A protein has these predicted regions:
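Membrane-interfacial helix-loop connectors
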Residues: 59-60, 68-95, 100-109, 117-121, ...
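Helix-loop-helix hairpins and the membrane-proximal interhelical loops
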Residues: 2-46, 136-182, 200
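Core mid-bundle transmembrane helix pairs that form the ion/substrate translocation pathway
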Residues: 118-179, 246-250, 279-298
C-alpha cells in the first residue's frame, strides 16, 4: 500500500509541476514583448513595481523564478535595488494565484480543457494560437495532476498513525514551519507545497490550524532559490535575495506571535468546512497583509539590507554587462540584452579599426597596444555572446 501511495503521489505531483510549467511557458510566450515593456517601464514607480511583480509571477508561475530574474536584472545594472524590492513584494502575492486555482475542484473539466488545447494546437498554423493552446493544455494537466495527487493520498485518512502524528507534531509552530521550509526547499516551488497541503486537506487529514504553520515555512523556503542564485552576483544582487528572505521571515514572526489565530478565524469564516479553500486563502492573505504592513517601511528595510551587505567596490566585472543567465527565464528580454552586447562589440570593433589605422599611419606604439586590447575585448565579447 505504501509503495502504491508513494508512486501515485510522485506521479500526481510530477503532472502538477509539469502542467504548471507548461501553462507558465504558454503565458510567457503570449505575453512576449509586452512582458518586456511592462518590466522596463512600470518598475520606475515603486508601487507599480509591486503590480509588475504580481503580474510577472502570474505569468511565470513561480515567485522564485521572478526573484531570480530580478536578481539578474540588478546584477546586470538594468534595475535598481529600490525598483527590485517592489517586484519582490508583488511576486509573493502573485505566487498565491496557483494555490487559489487548484483549491477549486475543477478536475472534471480538465480533459475537456486539454482536448480543446490539443485541437487548437493541431488545427492551426498561427504561432500565437499554438502558444495560447499550451496554456489550456498546461491548465488541464495541472488539475489532472492535482486530482491524481489527492487520490493517491486518500489511504492516509485510514491510517490513525499519520493523523495522530499530524495532530501531535503539526501543532508545534517550529516543527510546522520547518516542515514547510523543507518541503519547498525539496520541491523548489511554493505552489507545489501548497498543492500538497490542499491534497492532504481534501482527504481530511490536515486541519487548517496545522496547515498555517507549514504555509509560513513555505514562504521562507521559497527564498532559497534566489539566495543560491545570488551567490555569484554583485553585492546588489545579493541584497535583493536577502530582502526577499527578510520580508518573509519578518512576516512569519509577527504572524506567529500576533495574527495566527485571527488568520485561522478569518479563513474559516470565509469558507466554513472547506479546508482546501482555507489553505489557499491563508496563503494569499498572509502575503497581502505582509505587503501592506512592510511596504511603508521599504526604505528602512533597504538601509538595513545595506548595513548587512554594504555597498562597496565590486570584484572585477566581466566585459559583458547584460548577459546574465538568470534573465534567460524571460527570453524576449534576454534576446534584447544580447543585442546591447552586439552593439557594444560593434563599438569595440570600430575603435579597433580606428586604432589600427592610426597605428599604421603614425607608427605609434600606444595605438598598437590599444588596438591589441580592442582585439582581446572583441574576442571576449564573441565568446560570451556565443556561449549565452
Amino acid at each position: 500500500m505504501y509503495t502504491t501511495m508513494f508512486l501515485g503521489a510522485i506521479a500526481g505531483l510530477s503532472l502538477f509541476l509539469y502542467g504548471m510549467q507548461l501553462m507558465g511557458d504558454g503565458l510567457q510566450k503570449v505575453a512576449g514583448e509586452g512582458l518586456k515593456g511592462i518590466i522596463r517601464k512600470l518598475t520606475k514607480n515603486r508601487f507599480m513595481s509591486v503590480l509588475v511583480g504580481m503580474f510577472v509571477t502570474t505569468i511565470i508561475q513561480s515567485s522564485s523564478a521572478t526573484t531570480v530574474m530580478v536578481v539578474g536584472f540588478v546584477n546586470a545594472g538594468l534595475m535598481t535595488l529600490a525598483q527590485a524590492v517592489g517586484v519582490v513584494f508583488g511576486a509573493n502575492v502573485g505566487t498565491t494565484i496557483t494555490g487559489q486555482m487548484v483549491s477549486f475542484n475543477l478536475s472534471q473539466w480538465a480533459p475537456l480543457v486539454i482536448a480543446a488545447g490539443l485541437v487548437a494546437n493541431m488545427l492551426t498554423k498561427n504561432p500565437k494560437v499554438k502558444e495560447a493552446s499550451e496554456i489550456f493544455i498546461g491548465f488541464g494537466i495541472l488539475f489532472i495532476g492535482m486530482s491524481s495527487l489527492s487520490s493517491a493520498l486518500q489511504p492516509l485518512k485510514e491510517l490513525p498513525e499519520f493523523t495522530n502524528w499530524i495532530l501531535q507534531y503539526g501543532s508545534n509552530p517550529f516543527i510546522g514551519v520547518g516542515i514547510g521550509l523543507l518541503m519547498t526547499l525539496v520541491l523548489q516551488s511554493s505552489s507545489a507545497t501548497i498543492g500538497v497541503l490542499i491534497a492532504l486537506a481534501s482527504q481530511g487529514v490536515l486541519p487548517i490550524t496545522t496547515a498555517v504553520f507549514i504555509i509560513f515555512g513555505d514562504n521562507i523556503g521559497t527564498c532559497t532559490t534566489a539566495l543560491i542564485s545570488s551567490l555569484g552576483t554583485s553585492r546588489r544582487g545579493k541584497q535583493v535575495a536577502l530582502f526577499h528572505l527578510m520580508i518573509n521571515v519578518i512576516g512569519t514572526i509577527y504572524f506567529m506571535l500576533f495574527l495566527r489565530g485571527i488568520l485561522v478565524n478569518v479563513v474559516e469564516s470565509i469558507d466554513p468546512g472547506n479546508v482546501a479553500r482555507q489553505i489557499a486563502n491563508a496563503h494569499t492573505i498572509f502575503n497581502i497583509v505582509n505587503v501592506i504592513v512592510l511596504f511603508p517601511f521599504t526604505n528602512l528595510l533597504i538601509k538595513l539590507i545595506q548595513i548587512i551587505i554594504p555597498d562597496g567596490e565590486e570584484e572585477e566585472e566581466s566585459i559583458t554587462r547584460y548577459l546574465d543567465k538568470r534573465i534567460l527565464v524571460t527570453p524576449s528580454i534576454a534576446l534584447e540584452n544580447t543585442m546591447y552586447e552586439f552593439a557594444a562589440m560593434a563599438q569595440e570593433t570600430s575603435s579597433a579599426l580606428e586604432n589600427a589605422i592610426g597605428a599604421a599611419r603614425t607608427r605609434d606604439k600606444k595605438l598598437v597596444k590599444k588596438a591589441l586590447e580592442n582585439e582581446k575585448n572583441i574576442n571576449a565579447y564573441e565568446k560570451a555572446i556565443v556561449k549565452y
